[in-house]
Amino acid sequence: MNNNLFSKLLLWLLLITLPVTVFSQSTEFTIQDVKFESQGVTLAGSIIKPENPFAAVVFVHGSDPVKREMALAKRLAKEGIAVLTYDKRGVGESGGVYVGPSVGTNNIDSTNLNLLSNDANEAVKTLQTYLKNKKIPIGLIGVSQAGWIIPITANKNPQIEFMVLFSCPTITTLEQLRFQFYTNGNNNFWENHTDADAIEHTKNDPDKYQFEATDPKNYLSTLSIPGLWLFGEKDIQIPVKLCIEQLNKFKVKGKPFEYTLFSALGHNTVFDNDTTPFDISIQWIKQKTLNLKKTKSSK
């Protein structure tokens, strides 16, 4: 079945099976600027909050030096989800130092990824203090580099109850760099290469950098919270088929991990003009948070 057709069918099934009246939400929301401490520096962000949120999320950045993602946060708030989004460490109004470049040793070495996970964890704690209803599920949503940061963060904080990962790797940092150097930014890469070829190079090419690799599987293996990965098949930043291969191994073991593949999309699945990935993520969050609430009420 065509992957895009499958994605739209999945969205339709979610829509007809979900009791949407539970999540009726006006488009009104408030925006409140906040500051919080993390590892000795002050980070600045904004909380975008609808009147009666059914869930809350912290947005976790990709590797670039980016400020808070207000446009995405507003889209989430209009769907009934409270969001804390902040300027990345060393960017905008946030203190500290941005560790760059975005492609290179120090940006994705274990020290920096752990530091960024501490920032995300402190953001979760901060967001919780601004929620009137302390019982609503809180999760993490992120892009690209967040594929390493989110599992680390979720391991640090048992109050994180779900995760949504757009174009995020499930392979090691060194493997991702091998693939990225192999594709070399060529948007036509997949016209002349196969998945088998890409996987072979990702697993066996010599490393241009030498540092301790971070393997998200070490953290995902200890998690029992639901997770959704959304991939673009034309991605030239991460080897999607290899990432899916890793997720399938977790699924066989009973992990509550799901993924959706979009044949026409590349790396920026959440920011693409095609809103299907975003729409599917919203319906998934609604379904999972409803399940979480049922589980809590039955205890």
Predicted regions and their residues:
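N-terminal cap/lid segment of alpha/beta-hydrolase-fold proteins
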Residues: 25-51
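Short beta-strand element of the alpha/beta-hydrolase
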Residues: 54-62
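Short alpha-helix in the alpha/beta-hydrolase fold that links the catalytic acid
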Residues: 72, 225, 239-249
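Short beta-strand/loop motif that positions the catalytic acidic residue
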Residues: 223, 229-231, 235
